[in-house]
Amino acid sequence: MSVFITFAAALLIFGAVIAIHEFGHFAVAKLCGVQVNEFSIGMGPTLIKTYRKGTQYTLRLLPVGGFVALEGEESPESEQAEGGSGEDDGPDIPPEVLAQRTGKPLNEAAVWQRMLVMAAGAVMNFVLGFVVLLLLISLRSEPITSKVIYAVEDNALCGQTGLQAGDEIVAVNGRHCFVANDMLYELMRTESYRADFTVRRDGRLVELPDVRFDTWQDEQGQTHMTLGFTVYGLKKTPLNVLKESANSVIYYGRIIYTSLADLLRGRESINDLSGPVGIVTAIGQAASYGWEDVAELLGLITINLGVLNLLPFPALDGGKIVFLLIEAVTGHAVPEKIQGSLTVAAFALLFGLMLFATYNDIVRLVTGAV
């Protein structure tokens, strides 16, 4: 039963995240007058298809993705779409449908329109993340966690080194705290159990350098930090819920960028990379705890996909936007041969990283270090 729940939850999350991403590309392409030849949910052989205003809407066998095939776009998706070179998908498109394909090819759209089309997928991932977090925060029984200290424990080291009841935590180690979890995340990253705080005290900003925290050791000899203070809860007014949801999107997005930066700086080990197997394992664990954990993981994954897709990497939407920025500045498109070579190399690198991350996942499963 647990395997079925994991499988169902994984399909739900991956399906929702990818479908909303592709819908973003689809909707903005339509708004910009670009011809959309196919909008597909799923991959592989066609199960159901219908036509409307020159666009084929398809449900395919494998619920592991989706795609949008745009006229004038050189991509595997366009090749799979009917009317391209995908010859195993059934009969040719009816002539009356082809006659309705009056939109312009993507490569003939204005540069700014192409940039909007490329960015729209990631934007919709952020929108989905916001909606999921909005529902999650609204439906939870607990109040919103604020950044204002309610009380500092007696003899707590953090109180002896600067923090006071009533302080509103603004930043930790120079990083602005949008939500309470920003503070906790930054404290987790510190290896010395001390940090520089910026707080708002009596209406003015106060710098508190070198705030230190108590520690304790478990039976395995591992050291843990004790926070030493509690914070106020916030009432769930509509404004507070909206602000917390928007700030939580920023929080999750920044975690992803910070993790990548830590990886490049050597602060995090490449052995910590996780791939599809690890994600499915995490989904299974979340599903065993309840819908709230699944929803929070859905929010994290969709925001993760949005952030990663905007990275200036040739195989990603962000890389395509960089090519378009170069075209906008110079007035000349980057030669297709150069774009193609960079994209192939980037895909090879990403595929290699995915294989390595999958290897890490399998090792963790076998050794029990999940």
Where do the model's predicted regions map?
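PDZ peptide-recognition modules
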Residues: F4-I5, Q80-Q113, V117-A120, M124-L273, ...
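Alpha-helical transmembrane segments of integral membrane proteins
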Residues: T6-A9, I13, L300, A346-L353
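Hydrophobic alpha-helical segments of integral membrane proteins
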Residues: F39, R60, V64, M115-A119, ...
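Membrane interface segments of multi-pass transport proteins and intramembrane proteases
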Residues: L47-T50, V148-V152, L325-S341
